[in-house]
Amino acid sequence: MDDKKNAPSSDKSKALAAALAQIEKQFGKGSVMRMEDGAVVEEVQVVSTGSLGLDIALGVGGLPRGRVVEIYGPESSGKTTLTLQTIAEMQKLGGTCAFIDAEHALDVTYAQKLGINLSDLLISQPDTGEQALEICDALVRSGGVDLIVIDSVAALTPRAEIEGDMGDSLPGLQARLMSQALRKLTGSINRTNTLVIFINQIRMKIGVMFGNPETTTGGNALKFYASVRLDIRRTGSIKSGDEVIGNETKVKVVKNKIAPPFKEAHFDILYGEGTSREGEILDLGSDAKIVEKSGAWYSYNGERIGQGKDNARNYLKERPDLAREIENKVRVSLGVPELGAIKSDEPVAKKASAKESKEAKELKEVE
């Protein structure tokens, strides 16, 4: 009786082995493998967003490499600031970054203030949506770029629309362009471990009586292909006397394929400075009992670092090593990976290089 039960499973194993052999013969070794055989299961590599609270809300300590990310929100909510800070963080790790400025509105002086090394930043200002996405595809396939930002999806105007008359109706053209581009891009993005961030704008659906009337431009393809979607909103103003010096900002993780979604982060964006990272370190550090707060005084390891939040923030800004030490302790206490301080001349290690070295080793063994 047992032999009869085992016979079908034995036949299935033989059929599977034959199918795998055929696939490897046709498409090459490693086209299909068991999860435990190769380096398929890897820890997700991330890059910080420049906001400690948002890194923690993302669940893995930052934005994932080898994935598509969408950041959307109303005008002047901090979308471009967030991506520029991410570029600065990637450059600190020794990565190469590119900014595809479809809106033709990048403020180079502001980018420099946020810590971006302009001499290492690739920038493109394409004429059409097709040109922008072709440039993105070429950069991703090269394997030499670690982070690409496209600002924004709404500005990716199809060539037919630019060449046509002002009143021409061309329904679905941009959506088809995005759908085709993302089908081509996703495979090479994962293979080369490149992080691609799309900035998007919000539009209103006409005639919606119930539910949220807001939607993003460029159709539904980006919603599906994005591993992380961030909704960024301005919730208030920061004032110094009567002068407005920044925005209070809320970011909601609307979609997250690598950690639980729907978490929120609240932080301040100061004009000309970006996210108040040191302020977040003090707030989250005192919540985690890593930074002691007694009255108006902030202390760390028994040593006073400032009276009042502004003084303590300036103290940490002047001592980035101490700020990084406190931040990493906060990250560990909240179960998020620490930030590395390594910077090399070469781009951050690629998945492809590890795969190539493994294939070379196997080839050597065969020879």
Curated annotation (Swiss-Prot):
It comes from the Bacteria. SMART domains: AAA. GO terms for cellular component: cytosol. ATP binds at G73, P74, E75, S76, S77, G78, K79, T80. GO terms for molecular function: ATP binding; ATP hydrolysis activity; ATP-dependent DNA damage sensor activity; damaged DNA binding; single-stranded DNA binding. GO terms for biological process: DNA recombination; DNA repair; SOS response. Residues 345-367 are annotated as: Disordered. It is found in: Cytoplasm. The keyword Ribonucleoprotein does not apply. Belongs to the RecA family. HAMAP family: RecA. Can catalyze the hydrolysis of ATP in the presence of single-stranded DNA, the ATP-dependent uptake of single-stranded DNA by duplex DNA, and the ATP-dependent hybridization of homologous single-stranded DNAs. It interacts with LexA causing its activation and leading to its autocatalytic cleavage. PANTHER family: MITOCHONDRIAL DNA REPAIR PROTEIN RECA HOMOLOG-RELATED, RECA. This is Protein RecA. It comes from Janthinobacterium sp. (strain Marseille) (Minibacterium massiliensis).
